[in-house]
Structures are given as C-alpha cells and as structure tokens.
Amino acid sequence: MGVRDEIRKILPEVDLIENKDLREKVLSTWEEGLKRGGWRPLDIARMPFTLLKPVKISFADHVRSVTKVCLAVAETFDEIYKGALKLNRDILLAGALLHDVGKLLEVTETGGTFKKTKEGSLVRHPFSGLALADAQGLPAEVLHIIATHSKEGDPYKRTAEAIILHYADFMNFDPLEG
C-alpha cells in the first residue's frame, strides 16, 4: 500500500472532496508533511493532537472530528438556510483536513515521548502548514483557512469557511480535560 492509500485509510474524509485536483493537492500536502517531519502515515493515528494538555486523542482523530463537524455545519446550513449562505464545501473540507498539517513539522518523537521540534518552537503550525500547502499549489481560500484557524487569525477577517473551521477546531479542543 502506498503512502497516499495509507493517508486515505486513516483520513477517509479526503475522498469527500469532489474536485479531484484539490483532493490530490490535499494528499500531496499530507505526503510532503509526513516526509519532511520524518513520520509514517500510521504515526498520526498515535501522535497526540496537542502537547498543550494531556489528552488521549490522536492527531488523526482530531483532524477527522474537526472535518466531520465542519461538514455537519455545512450540511445543516444548506438544509435550513436553503442556500442563503453560500459555502464552498470542497474548500471547507480541504481546509479542515489541512488545518493542523503543520504539526507534522512542529512535533517529534524521542524515546516514545512527543515534544516540540526546534522549528515548532520558532514557527507555529498555522505558518508551517500554510507553507506546506502553498508549496503544493492549494488555492488561497484553503491557505486562508490554515493561516487563520488558530489565535494567529484573530486579528483578521475570516471567510465563512474559515469561521466554521475555527469554531469546529476549538469545539474539539476547549471542552477536553487536561
């Protein structure tokens, strides 16, 4: 099984992206992040999604949950608001799947312990994730979601998709005990 197939198995929501070119760029970004970070795809299923508090939720599970929350919000808005709020579902999905991809460069494992890399101490994951995605040719709308999803994006106006992702991400972080 190739790296992309492994990524698809761990993050099956990638296949919900209808635009093939966008889907391939999302996979390329994950592939490059894994390579540069020295990870294998299966590592994201055991890597913690945060080092800020001791939770037993994997990076992969966090990304999947955030993505599913975003999709549920988009579907609910479409059903209830009947198109009054135009969302780009593929852009939202790509942003959700990639919002934390920079953590592949922010975290390392030494002797079974996960810790920040030197790079991760200097450049937080919204910035490294933006760089990874930009290098793979992701559109500006996805780059915007990655860049503004965390506190770094607070001073800026977010698109509707970026707002949904921002709150979905914090819904999957703030309530967790640590």
Question: Where are the regions that the model predicts?
Answer:
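Acidic/His-rich, divalent-metal-binding segments that scaffold phosphate/diphosphate chemistry
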Residues: M1-G112
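Divalent metal-dependent catalytic cores for phosphoryl transfer on phosphate-bearing substrates
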Residues: F49-L52, D61, V73, A84-G178
